[in-house]
Swiss-Prot record:
Keyword Transmembrane helix: no
Record lineage: Eukaryota, Metazoa, Chordata, Craniata, Vertebrata
Cell compartment(s), UniProt: Nucleus, Nucleoplasm
A Pfam family annotated for this UniProt entry: C19orf84
Compositionally biased tracts (Pro residues): 24-36, 145-157
Principal location listed in the UniProt entry: nucleus
The protein, known as: piRNA-mediated silencing protein C19orf84
One GO BP annotation of this record: transposable element silencing by piRNA-mediated DNA methylation
Gene Ontology CC entries for this record: nucleoplasm
Species of origin: Homo sapiens
C-alpha cells in the first residue's frame, strides 16, 4: 500500500492549504493525459485531482435535459451576441456559409404554411380516406382506370347424391386480359 503523502488526509485527498489566508492560490496547470490512459476509469489518470474527479451528483433526467438545453441556448445566444467580423454592422452582410436566422422571438422559428392551407374545409383528425373529395383534380375516383374483374365462381360442392349441380359452363378467367390492359395503359 502507498504511504499518505505530505498534507494528505485519511481518505487520500490532498487538502494542503496555504499557510496564511492572504496568499493567492497558484494556478495549478493540468497536464494533458496520455492518450493511452483516456479509457481508464481511475480519476487520477484523467488529469484531475481525485477529490474533484470522484464527485457523484444525482440528477433527474428531465433536469439534466433542461440544463443541457439552457446551456446550448445560452451558448447560441452568446455566439449571436458576439460580432463575428468587424464589417457585421453593414446591412445584409453575413459571413460566407453562415445561415441567416430570424431574431428569436417568443415562439422561436415560425412555420410558414402554404397559401390556402389551414383555411376552409381542413379539419383535424380526418384520416386520408375520410377527407372530403372536393378540390381534387379529376373528381372522386381519380386514378388509373382498370376494368372490373370478375372473380371465378367458387368450386361447387357435390350434391348429396354424388352428382354436381347442373350449371352452365364456367366463364373463362379474365385476369390475363386485365393484366394486359394495365400494362398497355401505362
Amino acid at each position: 500500500m502507498e504511504q499518505p503523502k505530505d498534507g494528505a488526509g485519511p481518505e487520500g485527498n490532498n487538502l494542503s492549504l496555504p499557510s496564511s489566508g492572504t496568499e493567492p492560490w497558484p494556478p495549478a496547470p493540468l497536464p494533458a493525459p496520455p492518450p493511452l490512459l483516456l479509457n481508464s476509469t481511475d480519476p487520477t489518470h484523467l488529469g484531475l485531482p481525485e477529490s474533484v474527479a470522484s464527485v457523484t451528483v444525482p440528477i433527474r433526467l428531465d433536469t439534466l435535459s433542461c440544463l443541457l438545453h439552457s446551456a446550448l441556448l445560452g451558448a447560441y445566444t452568446f455566439q449571436q451576441a458576439l460580432p463575428s467580423c468587424p464589417c457585421c454592422s453593414q446591412a445584409g452582410h453575413s459571413q460566407p456559409g453562415a445561415v441567416r436566422r430570424p431574431p428569436r422571438g417568443r415562439g422561436g422559428w415560425e412555420v410558414r404554411h402554404r397559401p390556402g392551407w389551414g383555411r376552409g374545409l381542413h379539419r383535424r383528425g380526418l384520416g386520408r380516406a375520410e377527407q372530403p373529395e372536393r378540390g381534387r383534380a379529376g373528381g372522386p375516383g381519380a386514378g388509373p382506370r382498370t376494368p372490373p374483374m370478375t372473380l371465378p365462381s367458387p368450386p361447387t360442392l357435390p350434391a348429396q347424391d354424388g352428382k354436381k349441380e347442373a350449371r352452365g359452363p364456367e366463364p373463362p378467367l379474365e385476369t390475363p386480359l386485365a393484366a394486359e390492359d394495365w400494362e398497355t395503359e401505362y
